[in-house]
């Protein structure tokens, strides 16, 4: 599957101030919060996660503390206010009244975050648009295989040391501490291992089309931490004009509906009508 810098995907990942990008490929706060800290622990467990809001100077810019000391995959996946765009090295801001604010264009990231993953870091200006750059689409990759293997072992043999070994193959490449070093006690604890595998899949495979199916095959789409329905949050794109600090207030973006029937797709009526032995999926 071919993708290029001039394609709709790249445009939706590009800020409006950078060659009038569409900047609509937004990332939810819930995904942002699921990335680990640089010590390999979740934000709920890590002492590095700030107890109070505030800012830290990074490259001369005030960066919100919640985005400091995160793992490398966070910085490669999420584009946030104050980060520099790789083409012209411009600082990008999204607050209301900024160059990329909701008052400047109807195309704005609803959550105040842009997807950065898969954005080509080597694009340069060519007239009014970036150069075309071939990027293959991700269908199946080695990290997915490693985590599926760890998942199978978790369900069949939770004391098998290969579980941590294969999760750690992914974590090592990601540049974060290994579970064998920081959480060896979870080996043999099936529930803890399930959570470890699932959290790793959430982060490593984010925006690759896996999460939708993962939470359904695990039958956890109504469980805290995995919910596909309910309230979803982001940064405040509609604060007072020019008020940069108002942007950092987390606000409700949308309420989604998930019902039990959504664990399975409905069988098309045309197929059900072919045979009276064909039974429609539950609740449809």
Predicted regions and their residues:
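Acidic/polar-rich alpha-helix caps and helix-coil junctions
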Residues: 5-23, 33-284
């Amino acid at each position: 599957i071919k993708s290029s810098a001039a394609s709709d995907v790249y445009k939706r990942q590009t800020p409006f101030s950078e060659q009038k990008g569409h900047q609509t490929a937004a990332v939810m706060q819930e995904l942002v919060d699921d990335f680990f800290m640089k010590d390999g622990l979740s934000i709920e467990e890590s002492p590095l996660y700030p107890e109070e809001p505030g800012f830290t100077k990074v490259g001369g810019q005030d960066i919100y503390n919640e985005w400091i000391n995160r793992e490398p995959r966070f910085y490669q996946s999420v584009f946030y206010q104050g980060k520099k765009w790789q083409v012209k090295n411009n600082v990008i801001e999204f607050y209301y009244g900024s160059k990329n604010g909701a008052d400047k264009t109807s195309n704005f990231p609803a959550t105040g975050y842009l997807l950065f993953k898969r954005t080509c870091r080597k694009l340069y200006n060519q007239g009014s648009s970036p150069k075309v750059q071939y990027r293959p689409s991700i269908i199946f990759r080695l990290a997915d295989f490693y985590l599926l293997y760890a998942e199978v072992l978790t369900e069949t043999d939770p004391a098998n040391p290969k579980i941590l070994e294969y999760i750690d193959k992914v974590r090592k490449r990601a540049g974060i501490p290994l579970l064998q070093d920081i959480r060896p006690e979870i080996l043999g604890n099936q529930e803890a291992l399930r959570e470890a595998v699932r959290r790793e899949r959430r982060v490593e495979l984010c925006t690759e089309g896996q999460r939708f199916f993962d939470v359904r095959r695990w039958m956890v789409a109504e469980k805290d931490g995995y919910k596909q329905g309910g309230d979803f949050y982001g940064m405040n794109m509609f604060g007072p004009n020019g008020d940069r600090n108002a942007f950092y207030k987390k606000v409700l973006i949308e309420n989604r509906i998930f019902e039990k029937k959504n664990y399975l797709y409905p069988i098309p009526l045309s197929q059900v009508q072919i045979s009276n032995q064909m039974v429609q999926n539950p609740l449809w």
